[in-house]
């Protein structure tokens, strides 16, 4: 019996650390597409495994936060949806969105953005998102300007420049 007890205790400890690691890991990697599902699973298991006082309190807070931040970016998503040009520029500027999602359509990239914000959870999800919007906007314009400059300089000027130099 004495042997059984420590192993049990050890098991619970291990499970607890696993759930915490799961949380940390899932928060750390915003590349997961199923963050919502993972979070709900983590919350379920966390409250199940870890001490109910700790687990449920922490995890319910997490869940509330997640939904909160999840809902906020979706609101900004609608405005993005209304403005496809902004959406397009944002997709170009942000390296996080791979081209396939661009090609597949707005729905996919929309969900991608929302999970991205969810991954950034700690309070920056929303702040960073808003910042991104303004930054991305300016960045898109800047990028456009510099791109057109580069293309004009590199493309036309070098072409028209080298024959002129030859002449």
Curated annotation (Swiss-Prot):
Top-level taxon of origin: Eukaryota
Alphabetic keyword roster: Acetylation, Autoimmune encephalomyelitis, Cell membrane, Citrullination, Membrane, Methylation, Phosphoprotein
Gene Ontology terms: cellular component: compact myelin; internode region of axon; neuronal cell body; plasma membrane
Location(s) in or outside the cell: Myelin membrane
Pfam families given in the database record: Myelin_MBP (PF01669)
Matches recorded under PROSITE patterns: MYELIN_MBP
Positions of the UniProt region annotated as Induces experimental autoimmune encephalomyelitis (EAE) 2: 114-122
Location of region: Induces experimental autoimmune encephalomyelitis (EAE) 1: 45-87
Symmetric dimethylarginine modifications at: 106
Tagged with keyword Phosphoprotein: yes
Residues the record lists as N6-acetyllysine modifications: 121
Residues annotated with Phosphotyrosine modification: 14, 69
Residues with Citrulline modification: 25, 31, 129, 156, 167
UniProt membrane topology term: Peripheral membrane protein
Residues where N-acetylalanine is found: 1
A GO molecular-function descriptor: structural constituent of myelin sheath
Main localization of the protein described in the UniProt heading: membrane
Residue list for modification Phosphothreonine: 17, 20, 35, 67, 94, 97
An annotated GO BP: myelination
Changes after translation: At least 5 charge isomers; C1 (the most cationic, least modified, and most abundant form), C2, C3, C4 and C5 (the least cationic form); are produced as a result of optional post-translational modifications such as phosphorylation of serine or threonine residues, deamidation of glutamine or asparagine residues, citrullination and methylation of arginine residues. C1 and C2 are unphosphorylated, C3 and C4 are monophosphorylated and C5 is phosphorylated at two positions.
Residues modified as Phosphoserine: 7, 12, 19, 40, 56, 76, 114, 158, 162
UniProt record similarity statement: Belongs to the myelin basic protein family.
Record protein name field: Myelin basic protein
Organism: Cavia porcellus (Guinea pig)
């Amino acid at each position: 019996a004495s042997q059984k007890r420590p192993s049990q205790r050890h098991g619970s400890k291990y499970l607890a650390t696993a759930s915490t690691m799961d949380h940390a890991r899932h928060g750390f990697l915003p590349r997961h597409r199923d963050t919502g599902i993972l979070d709900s699973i983590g919350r379920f298991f966390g409250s199940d495994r870890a001490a109910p006082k700790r687990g449920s309190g922490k995890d319910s807070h997490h869940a509330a936060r997640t939904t909160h931040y999840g809902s906020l970016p979706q609101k900004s998503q609608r405005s993005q949806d209304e403005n496809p040009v902004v959406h397009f520029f944002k997709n170009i500027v942000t390296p996080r969105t791979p081209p396939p999602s661009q090609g597949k359509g707005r729905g996919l990239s929309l969900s991608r953005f929302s999970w991205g914000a969810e991954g950034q959870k700690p309070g920056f999800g929303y702040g960073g998102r808003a910042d991104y919007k303004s930054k991305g906007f300016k960045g898109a314009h800047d990028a456009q300007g510099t791109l057109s400059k580069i293309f004009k300089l590199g493309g036309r000027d070098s072409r028209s420049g080298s024959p002129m130099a030859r002449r």
